[in-house]
């Protein structure tokens, strides 16, 4: 097929690494948008960081919803490529883009209209709440750019061309890095300046994707961006992407509750610690997500082509790679938590509280990487429901655990321990689940249910 890479032949280690590195770098770039905002806004003080941190849960939720079409693209297009069906690959690509636009407009409108009651959930001081509402309304108008770019990224990943999203996202990051200090301090816009800078960068990424697909690439032989939705393709996309989007969205709802609890226990410092710590933790998350996405795309093609031995070897290789990095992140967070947190929020009370969070959370980093790597295996073979079941169940266990630990007198640290314990459980359970079903689900690798 035109414009794609065949992942069913050739050296597995090199293909996985070459595919994972740009995806991982792209994930880091997407993470860097938030970290760049956080680092500059951190110079305004912990209250400003708390304001954008409260919105950060909602932008995370938005990114989670966009996974419906990112994962939907990666798996549906990837399996169509593996099955040598270019017509299906083109149709899936068009359907994913169309669905992404519809969902993003609806979701962005809801956030814009209900920004005030949503932000007031956190019970922050009035001036912090006002800043957060303005920030959210600006960000919400740019959600179509985020959703469509996620769908474009999924299509390129499925085609084995993960370098393209990397370079495009990198361009957006550079623009955001330049605009952040200009808008925040130069124009004196404060937290709103960070929102405007991010909006412009995300719009630029979207426009570059459009130019790349329309004027430079003939990916899949060319396909229309928008199409009349057909039940066959729409149902398959939702079957693949909805469990992933649901588990990540519900995860964000859980974190919204934990954020409120952190705010009650530690006021704006507690909320700031949890949201900023989560952004820093994304170092591990995005690394494992990069390998997981590469593994998913690799397995999708090889599973559809009946290459079971390549599926298993790719799984073993990815576990080894992510295990090394997970161990490194554990050591970094446990022993250098204060120093890492101070890079983003140099206020002493903030980085001391953040250091405690990173130390506790650091114990679970290896297991987080294990969980996300295993998600890539399940997604690649088209079984997105098991990871959703495990993730949703364990994530919701954080709420009663956090309440229990707080009532035991552990304070805000009880919330951190609830997060750590459930993360360990998710990794171990998902690995065990796949080991149990591995023989059965790979016995007829060419079977792809619609």
Residue ranges and their predicted role:
Residues 46-57, 136, 195, 268-283, ...:
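Small-residue hotspots at the loop-to-helix junctions and early N-terminal turns
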Residues 28, 32-50, 119-126, 182-189, ...:
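Helix-terminus/linker motif at the lipid-water interface of multi-pass membrane proteins
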Residues 18-37, 138, 149, 172, ...:
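Transmembrane helical elements of multi-pass membrane transporters/channels
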């Amino acid at each position: 097929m035109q414009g794609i890479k065949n992942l069913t032949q050739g050296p597995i280690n090199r293909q996985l690494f070459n595919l994972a590195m740009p995806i991982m770098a792209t994930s880091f770039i997407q993470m860097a948008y938030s970290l760049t905002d956080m680092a500059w806004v951190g110079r305004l003080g912990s209250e400003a960081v708390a304001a954008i941190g409260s919105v950060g849960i909602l932008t995370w939720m938005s990114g989670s919803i966009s996974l419906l079409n990112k994962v939907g693209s990666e798996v549906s297009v990837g399996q169509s490529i593996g099955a040598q069906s270019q017509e299906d690959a083109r149709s899936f690509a068009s359907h994913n883009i169309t669905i992404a636009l519809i969902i993003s407009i609806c979701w962005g409108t809801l956030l814009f209209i209900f920004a005030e009651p949503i932000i007031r959930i956190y019970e922050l001081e009035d001036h912090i709440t006002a800043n957060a509402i303005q920030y959210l309304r600006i960000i919400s108008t740019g959600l179509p750019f985020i959703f469509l770019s996620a769908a474009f990224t999924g299509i390129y990943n499925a085609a084995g061309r993960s370098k393209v999203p990397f370079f495009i996202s990198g361009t957006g990051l550079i623009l955001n890095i330049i605009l952040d200090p200009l808008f925040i301090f130069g124009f004196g816009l404060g937290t709103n300046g960070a929102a405007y800078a991010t909006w412009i960068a995300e719009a630029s990424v979207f426009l570059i994707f459009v130019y790349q697909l329309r004027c430079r690439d003939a990916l899949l032989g060319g396909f229309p961006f928008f199409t009349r939705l057909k039940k066959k393709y729409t149902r398959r996309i939702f079957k693949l992407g909805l469990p992933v989007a649901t588990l990540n969205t519900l995860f964000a709802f859980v974190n919204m509750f934990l954020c409120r609890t952190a705010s009650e226990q530690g006021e704006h410092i507690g909320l700031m610690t949890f949201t900023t710590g989560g952004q820093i933790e994304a170092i591990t998350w995005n690394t494992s997500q990069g390998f997981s996405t590469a593994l998913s795309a690799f397995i999708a093609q090889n599973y559809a082509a009946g290459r079971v031995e390549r599926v298993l070897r790719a799984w073993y290789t990815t576990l080894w790679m992510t295990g090394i990095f997970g161990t490194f992140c554990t050591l970094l967070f446990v022993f250098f938590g204060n120093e890492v947190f101070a890079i983003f929020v140099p206020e002493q009370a903030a980085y001391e509280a953040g250091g405690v969070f990173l130390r506790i959370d650091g114990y679970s980093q290896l297991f987080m990487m294990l969980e996300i790597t295993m998600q890539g295996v399940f997604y690649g073979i088209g079984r997105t429901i098991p990871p959703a079941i495990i993730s949703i169940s364990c994530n919701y266990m954080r709420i009663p655990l956090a309440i229990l630990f707080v009532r035991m007198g552990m304070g805000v640290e009880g919330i951190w321990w609830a997060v750590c314990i459930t993360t360990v459980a998710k990794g171990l359970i998902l690995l065990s689940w796949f080991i149990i079903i591995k023989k059965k689900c790979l016995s007829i690798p060419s079977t792809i249910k619609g």
